[in-house]
Amino acid sequence: MTKTRKTHPLXKIINHSFIDLPAPSNISAWWNFGSLLGLCLAIQILTGLFLAMHYTSDTMTAFSSVTHICRDVNYGWLIRYMHANGASMFFICLFLHVGRGLYYGSYTYFETWNIGVILLFAVMATAFMGYVLPWGQMSFWGATVITNLLSAIPYIGTTLVEWIWGGFSVDKATLTRFFAFHFVLPFIIAALVMVHLLFLHETGSNNPSGLISDSDKIPFHPYYTIKDILGVLLLISALMTLVLFSPDLLGDPDNYTPANPLSTPPHIKPEWYFLFAYAILRSIPNKLGGVLALVFSILILMLFPLLHLSKQRSMMFRPLSQCMFWILVADLFTLTWIGGQPVEYPFVIIGQLASILYFTIILLILPTVSLIENKLLKW
């Protein structure tokens, strides 16, 4: 008798995606982050839903409503800090997931990769709008500074900014629409995730060697379900340690001061996961140039399939490319550090050099090194 999971229309989809899915036998722990991102998204949607039940998106009451959630709502403090730090865990998993894709050449699956980049943009937009909602000082000024960047667009810039603000400054209209978008975007992200998986399952997973693994596949369940559960336990342990021991470790103290349009904080900076892009933005003295560099710093990921000149897919057997990859990672850490520093010597020059290095490695050095490796192997 055929099993229900193989015949029932709904159970069949789940079966083909998570149970009888043929998976390469050699995928390492770096392949755990996809499922962890799914878990992060689920945590964020659930905690966010409960926060939305008590939050009010009005400039007069937003800050107080967040305080009320933390003080008066049953386990409100836990929900709020799980949501705030859940975003950090989300981005850690995202960066590692993208890094894995770059290292092992997963970007050669064009559709999966490009939808992944769109997902990255969507998650960044959602996180930015979520940061505005508590209506603290850094929320307000972060929103003002980042939305104001659009005014650099020639001709329509100013009109566009005022249209997004819903007035002549960040105010009630801005907060209300940011809340609306922040609420709806995660569901759009969930839909995009399904498309991401749809395209991935058309080709099957990549593996560390970068070789075709059709001759050596194993069922996803139980092998990778149990492996994913280990990742889930580690992620939840890390998240709960952060939430219960130092929930404000990654936040900004300025956000405990209610938003005041008349007083600018000495150092306006976004959350840690945007600092690398913020450093690239600040390293260019021209406003439009900075905005273009900021957008291109993420959009450049879409160029990776075109810049792949190696005859091998993965970096597993390419020591020179590996070396450049880890220099790129170190450069991103440097940019993250610089993004959190004030705009003064020597941080400005370090930021500019790190920004130049970031684009040079991706656009010039990695492709060149790939060609050198091809030559060394007489390919």
Curated annotation (Swiss-Prot):
Binding site for heme b b566: 97, 196
Binding site for a ubiquinone: 201
GO cellular component: mitochondrial inner membrane; respiratory chain complex III
Molecular function terms from GO: metal ion binding; ubiquinol-cytochrome-c reductase activity
Binding site for heme b b562: 83, 182
Annotated compartments: Mitochondrion inner membrane
Keywords per UniProt: Electron transport, Heme, Iron, Membrane, Metal-binding, Mitochondrion, Mitochondrion inner membrane, Respiratory chain, Transmembrane, Transmembrane helix, Transport, Ubiquinone
Membrane topology type: Multi-pass membrane protein
PANTHER family for the chain: CYTOCHROME B
Annotated function: Component of the ubiquinol-cytochrome c reductase complex (complex III or cytochrome b-c1 complex) that is part of the mitochondrial respiratory chain. The b-c1 complex mediates electron transfer from ubiquinol to cytochrome c. Contributes to the generation of a proton gradient across the mitochondrial membrane that is then used for ATP synthesis.
Family indicated by similarity: Belongs to the cytochrome b family.
Name recorded for this polypeptide: Cytochrome b
Species annotation: Urocitellus washingtoni (Washington ground squirrel)
Lineage: Eukaryota, Metazoa, Chordata, Craniata, Vertebrata
Gene field: MT-CYB
